[in-house]
Structure formats: structure tokens, C-alpha cells
């Protein structure tokens, strides 16, 4: 079929969840790759991931003293970037449903001066354990594509953000530059699973990361979903030629 990158032919993807529902499969997948997740992210992004996280923190309009939530926080790298901005008077809550990712997050926070303002919780992004209007803003990094119901996940983020607050997603996107996009998808289709096999011993897990990125909506489509869910000022910012994008919107005041 033609993929959503615009004309690059690939085999139709039917993600194999090994007899499990998507939520259980994704949870098992991230539990299995948690120990080497940060190293693999840096390798796959050629070290650009830190800068992308900083840009997401700017987009969510984090400021000193704010209270923010980081959904699908994983190893807490984005949570840490948020904490550096909100400072000691602020508070960050990171939520993830992978126990092993949260264990790795605890290790990452152990020597951080921001540990005291970051609370890590295991929970379900489809049913956030927070009251309405609890946070000044919400982020999700490389997480929405793993949810069984993307729109419900976005709606939950909107629910827990205060009126006027920002909802921000940082995730894989669909590059559009001719020539570049074909090379990128070849890299992501062939080399990323190979890297996962060599450095993490988890080729199948990294094949899922490829497949889920291909099936994830384009940055424009995700911005449209944000608007459909009720956010205003929806937009996207392409990073690295559209390989990654930040999609954002504001909860109406």
C-alpha cells in the first residue's frame, strides 16, 4: 500500500501483538527494553533527542513554580527537562504503566538535584488518576502511538490540565522532503531493528517501534485530532526535517 509519507511503497503493516491486546503487548515490550532504552534513543536520534525535549518544554510553556504532568514518562528524561524549568517551587508528576521503565526512571533521578520535585507513578494513560484541572500543562513524549485509543488519551490529558494550559506531544512524524523521506524510512525499517538486535538484543521490540511510527498519524493529522478533542491554537513544529514533530494545543480558558 502507499504509506502516509506520500508515495513510498511498503508492505501493509499488521502489527503482531502475539495474541495479547495492544496495551498488554506494549507494556511487555517496554518492560523488556527499559534498561537500554535511553542509550538506544540517543543512538537512533544521533544525539538530537535532548534538544527535542528542550523544545517540547518550551512549547508547553513551563515556567518556574508550575505543576506539570508528563504522561508515558518512561525513563523520566522529559520529566527531568520539565523539572529544570519549573524549579524547586514547581512540581512534576511522571506517569507510566511500565514498571521497568519506572525503575529505570528512579535510577536516572537518583543523583539529580530535582529528584524531590518529581513524583513517579505507575498508571494508565487511558484513565489518569488525577482530578480535573490539576496541572498547568501536560506533555507526552513518544507515547501517544502506544495507546489503544489515541483520542481518549488526548481527552484525558485535556481533562487534567487547567483551562489555558498547553497539551504537547513529542513523537515520530512523517518527513516530506523528497528523497530524504525514502532514506529515512529505509533507515527506520531496516537499521533500527538491527540496532535493537545488536545493542539491546530486542529486534522484535524495535520492529514494533518502527511499525507503530509508520501507523501513527502524520503531524497534521495529529494536530487535527487535537482540535477535534477540543484544543485551540493547535499546531505542529517539524524537527529534523519532519522526522520528529511537536504537536500542541491549548485548553480553552
From Swiss-Prot:
GO BP annotations listed: menaquinone biosynthetic process; methylation
Keyword Iron-sulfur: no
Binding-site positions, S-adenosyl-L-methionine: 75, 96, 124-125
Presence of keyword Phosphoprotein: no
Cross-referenced PROSITE patterns: SAM_MT_UBIE (PS51608), UBIE_1 (PS01183)
InterPro entries named among the record's database cross-references: SAM-dependent_MTases_sf, UbiE/COQ5_MeTrFase, UbiE/COQ5_MeTrFase_CS
One function term, GO molecular function aspect: demethylmenaquinone methyltransferase activity
Keywords per UniProt: Menaquinone biosynthesis, Methyltransferase, S-adenosyl-L-methionine, Transferase
Enzyme class of the recorded protein, top EC level: transferase
Record pathway: Quinol/quinone metabolism; menaquinone biosynthesis; menaquinol from 1,4-dihydroxy-2-naphthoate: step 2/2
E.C. code: 2.1.1.163
Catalytic activity: a 2-demethylmenaquinol + S-adenosyl-L-methionine = a menaquinol + S-adenosyl-L-homocysteine + H(+)
UniProt feature coiled coil, ranges: none
Function: Methyltransferase required for the conversion of demethylmenaquinol (DMKH2) to menaquinol (MKH2).
HAMAP family: MenG_UbiE_methyltr (MF_01813)
NCBIfam families: MenG_MenH_UbiE (TIGR01934), PRK00216.1-4 (NF001243), PRK00216.1-5 (NF001244)
Family label: Belongs to the class I-like SAM-binding methyltransferase superfamily. MenG/UbiE family.
Protein name per Swiss-Prot or TrEMBL: Demethylmenaquinone methyltransferase
Species name: Desulfitobacterium hafniense (strain Y51)
Gene: menG
Amino acid at each position: 500500500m502507499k504509506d502516509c509519507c506520500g508515495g513510498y511503497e511498503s508492505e501493509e503493516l499488521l502489527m503482531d501483538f502475539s495474541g495479547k491486546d495492544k496495551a498488554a503487548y506494549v507494556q511487555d515490550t517496554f518492560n523488556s527494553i527499559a534498561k537500554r532504552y535511553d542509550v538506544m534513543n540517543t543512538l537512533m536520534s544521533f544525539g538530537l533527542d535532548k534538544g527535542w525535549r528542550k523544545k517540547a518544554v518550551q512549547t508547553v510553556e513551563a515556567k518556574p513554580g508550575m505543576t506539570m504532568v508528563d504522561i508515558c514518562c518512561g525513563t523520566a528524561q522529559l520529566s527531568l527537562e520539565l523539572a529544570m524549568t519549573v524549579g524547586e517551587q514547581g512540581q512534576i508528576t511522571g506517569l507510566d504503566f511500565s514498571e521497568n521503565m519506572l525503575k529505570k526512571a528512579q535510577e536516572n533521578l537518583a543523583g539529580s538535584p530535582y529528584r524531590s520535585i518529581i513524583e513517579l507513578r505507575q498508571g494508565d494513560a487511558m484513565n489518569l488518576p488525577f482530578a480535573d484541572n490539576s496541572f498547568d500543562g501536560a506533555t507526552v513524549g513518544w507515547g501517544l502511538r502506544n495507546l489503544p485509543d489515541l483520542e481518549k488519551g488526548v481527552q484525558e490529558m485535556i481533562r487534567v490540565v487547567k483551562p489555558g494550559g498547553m497539551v504537547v506531544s513529542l513523537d515520530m512524524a512523517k518527513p516530506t522532503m523528497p528523497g530524504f523521506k525514502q532514506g529515512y524510512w529505509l533507515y527506520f525499517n531496516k537499521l533500527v531493528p538491527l540496532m535493537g538486535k545488536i545493542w539491546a538484543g530486542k529486534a522484535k521490540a524495535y520492529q514494533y517501534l518502527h511499525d507503530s511510527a509508520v501507523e501513527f498519524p502524520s503531524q497534521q493529522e495529529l494536530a487535527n485530532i487535537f482540535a477535534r478533542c477540543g484544543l485551540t491554537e493547535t499546531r505542529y513544529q517539524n524537527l529534523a526535517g519532519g522526522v520528529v514533530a511537536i504537536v500542541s494545543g491549548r485548553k480553552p480558558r
